[in-house]
Amino acid sequence: MNNKMNIPLSGIIPPLVTPLLDDDVLDVEGLQRLIEHLIAGGVHALFVLGTTGESQSLSYKLRVEMIKNTCRIAKGRLPVLVCISDTSIVESVNLACLAADHGADAVVSAPPYYFATGQPELIEFYEHLLPQLPLPLFLYNMPTHTKVNFAPATIQRIAENPGVIGFKDSSANTVYFQSVMYAMKDNPDFSMLVGPEELMAESVLLGAHGGVNGGANMFPELYVSLYNAAKNADMEELRRLQEKVMQISATIYTVGQHGSSYLKGLKCALSLLGICSDYVAAPFHKFEQRERGKIWKALQNLGVDVVLR
């Protein structure tokens, strides 16, 4: 493990979008602008190839390019976490080894997501995976996509391996997340991270270490400031910033009637901000001009002066 990653990992760790020019063409210049934008905004680490990064819609070639270019651009300035979730344990290990070769600091794994797994099978899966990994591992709970929740006792069992250093929860279930925090209370070096940005501040107030929040792609300073307000229990500032986060959630992520609205809105906003392309991997499509106008209006209402292009 590189010395630059503090344990437990804390703060705002944006799940990077994967900037695309076509289904199998990485927008490398856009990725450069995005990473510099995030570093300038004070984020604490980078997380690539997660759900926001459209990993499961990308070819292995493109995933490899994303890993290589992210590590090259970051240049060790902050930790890089790489998601290796896959239906094939062999491919997960291959991605982990490539991530290590290019200087990443940790890997992240959700359960294999095609066949539904039980808790004993989850334990066996990670007992098989962990000895093959060259980097520390974060467990990733995404039950809407994987059809299974990590039971708190399962996390305890898997985390008996010292190579498991944290947990990212995207269930949006605060009772569940608190149950996991309670189960892991005797392991202070185990990083507890929450995915939904709407829940980040309250989670940090109650002891979580930070958030893996998609909106930080657009406004890293906002999410870092909200994290700091929660960390310092500055309730007045927290309420003010939380309102901004909820405004983003209620406007930029809700254009359209489909589950892809979050991703399309986020990428459209990044395009309007001049950061990267708004191309979305198949089977989805980027917003048409009418929806783009709604995102432009949402940015204007947030006080961001951008030109509608």
Question: Language model features by range: what are they?
Answer:
Residues 2-149:
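Active-site beta->alpha loop and helix N-cap motifs at the rims of alpha/beta catalytic domains
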Residues 26, 201-309:
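Structured C-terminal cap/extension of enzyme domains
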Residues 31, 63, 67, 92, ...:
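A general structural signal for well-ordered alpha-helical segments in protein cores
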Residues 41, 65, 69-73, 98, ...:
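Alpha-helical structural signal in soluble globular domains
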Residues 82-85, 140, 170, 193-194, ...:
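Active-site-adjacent beta-strand anchor residues
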Residues 131-132, 145-249:
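Catalytic alpha/beta core domains of metabolic enzymes, predominantly
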